[in-house]
């Protein structure tokens, strides 16, 4: 039952029907209070609606119920927290993303699906690293090694996205060549 509620809530969230998504998530939590995924989804929807206290409570409950799971919960908690606590949440999320990226690199299966998963994880990891770097520019700017940490994190994030940009440019050039090859010649 709660799986159906969460699936419907995800569809509502994707179509920006936040009121219905929130109602469905609350129903899922009420039906299954020990379901970490239901609490995580409730937290995500609450963030979208601006209910920050309820979001934090739901996300914390999700983490209490199971430490395993997606990095999103930790990244959201990093956004909601301040200073060192924010850093701890973000670092946990980044650790999960690193593990997921490594697993995607060594996984077997459908090539396009694996590439899509790896790409999505790599982009999320780069964003997470930038979020931590931003902390060292703001809340943690007075830490002794803030500048070095910020620089290292930003550099790591750039190293992750550079190959992605090269692949994008290569695909664009291939599409352009293909278009030119199939374009009929016209006389002027």
Question: What residue ranges belong to the model's regions?
Answer:
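Acidic, Ser/Thr- and Gly/Pro-rich intrinsically disordered linkers and low-complexity segments
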Residues: 100-122
């Amino acid at each position: 039952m709660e799986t159906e509620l969460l699936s419907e809530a995800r569809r509502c969230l994707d179509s920006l029907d936040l009121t219905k998504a929130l109602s469905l998530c609350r129903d899922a939590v009420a039906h299954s209070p020990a379901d970490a995924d239901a609490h995580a989804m409730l937290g995500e929807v609450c963030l979208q609606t601006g209910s920050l206290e309820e979001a934090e409570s739901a996300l914390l409950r999700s983490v209490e119920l199971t430490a395993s799971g997606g990095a999103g919960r930790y990244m959201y908690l990093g956004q909601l927290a301040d200073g060192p606590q924010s850093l701890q949440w973000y670092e946990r999320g980044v650790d999960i993303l690193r593990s997921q990226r490594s697993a995607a690199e060594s996984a077997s299966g459908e090539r396009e699906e694996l590439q899509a998963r790896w790409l999505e994880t790599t982009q999320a990891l780069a964003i997470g690293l930038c979020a931590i770097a931003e902390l060292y520019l703001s809340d943690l700017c007075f830490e002794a090694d803030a500048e070095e940490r910020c620089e290292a994190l930003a550099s790591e994030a750039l190293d992750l996205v550079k190959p992605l940009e090269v692949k994008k440019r290569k695909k664009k050039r291939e599409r352009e060549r293909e278009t030119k090859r199939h374009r009929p010649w016209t006389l002027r």
